[in-house]
């Protein structure tokens, strides 16, 4: 393997970007039509992923932006960026603060402190947003478009039945590196593209700080391992990643596979068939 193959493979040409653009837009239209719905709901966070999905969707279906900030954890500028994007795209949008809803859920378990269940508390916000997304979806006859990318899906960096609760993942096969390329190709504002990615789970939270690795390096590791089928030694030559970190990434991917899997169903027919053949 030549040094740099991982990064080179992640870079999309202009022709490839156009192909991705067309494929995603056609798929959005197809899913909306097959679902017999009128359009799509996108939860706009002011971040790059939701901005890209909204930009793509706005070109082909009736898109509606739902901006759901929690003042306790979201920066006001993010909501403003979401509003500015919706206006620039010419799509309808609504701002609904979810702080009181989140606080009411927290209050239902007053004996639990934040240190005891930090993850449980953090996951409440994406799950509240999922409820709001589907409330709007049911009211208006729209599908819910998710904003997760391939890096997040592989790493399990999303909330099960939260931001993972959607009808379609338009950019779910694009690594974060490619999301940035697509965003520039589609004209997403540079101030959105350049801001540190954050799930907005708490004040000052960023994806890269929480995962302990930069997206650029992480994408090289994931792309090299899963798309190119390279060994650790080959990936290490290209990225310089140490074996302990590589192993940690692979373990996280494995441990979070359940998040993207269909809930298991006990195969009763098989059990009864076996019983009757004895």
Residues covered by each model-derived region:
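ATP-dependent adenylation/nucleotidyltransferase module used to activate substrates
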Residues: 2-158, 235
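A non-catalytic, amphipathic alpha-helix used as a structural packing/dimerization or gating element
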Residues: 19-27, 174-185, 227, 248
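A glycine-rich phosphate-binding loop feature that marks nucleotide/adenosyl-phosphate handling sites
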Residues: 43-46, 196-201, 270-271
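Helix N-cap / loop-to-helix initiation motif
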Residues: 49, 175, 189, 214, ...
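Catalytic subdomain that performs nucleotidyl-dependent activation
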Residues: 87, 118-129, 143-220
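Short, amphipathic alpha-helical "recognition" segments used to contact nucleic acids or chromatin
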Residues: 218-229
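Intrinsic disorder and flexible/low-complexity segments
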Residues: 232-278
């Amino acid at each position: 393997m030549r040094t740099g193959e991982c990064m080179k493979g992640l870079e999309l040409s202009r022709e490839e970007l156009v192909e991705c653009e067309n494929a995603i837009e056609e798929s959005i239209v197809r899913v909306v039509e097959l679902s017999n719905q009128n359009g799509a709901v996108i939860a706009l966070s002011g971040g790059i992923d939701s901005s890209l999905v909204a930009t793509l969707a706005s070109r082909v279906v009736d898109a509606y932006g739902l901006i759901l900030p929690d003042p306790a954890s979201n920066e006001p500028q993010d909501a403003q960026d979401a509003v500015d994007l919706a206006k620039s795209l010419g799509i309808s949008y609504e701002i609904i603060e979810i702080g009181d809803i989140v606080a009411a859920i927290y209050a239902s378990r007053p004996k639990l402190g934040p240190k005891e269940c930090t993850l449980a508390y953090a996951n409440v916000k994406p799950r509240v947003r999922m409820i709001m997304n589907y409330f709007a979806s049911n009211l208006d006859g729209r599908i819910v478009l998710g904003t997760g990318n391939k890096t997040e899906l592989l790493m399990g960096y999303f909330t099960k039945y939260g931001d993972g609760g959607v009808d379609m993942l338009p950019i779910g096969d694009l690594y974060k590196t490619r999301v940035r390329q697509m965003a520039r190709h589609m004209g997403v504002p540079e101030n959105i593209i350049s801001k540190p990615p954050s799930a907005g789970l708490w004040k000052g939270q960023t994806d890269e700080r929480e995962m302990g690795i930069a997206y650029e390096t992480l994408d090289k590791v994931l792309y090299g391992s899963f798309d190119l089928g390279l060994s650790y030694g080959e990936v290490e030559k290209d990225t310089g990643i140490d074996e302990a970190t590589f192993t940690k990434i692979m373990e996280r991917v494995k441990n979070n596979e359940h998040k993207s899997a269909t809930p298991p169903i006990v195969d009763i027919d098989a059990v009864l068939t076996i019983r009757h053949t004895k």
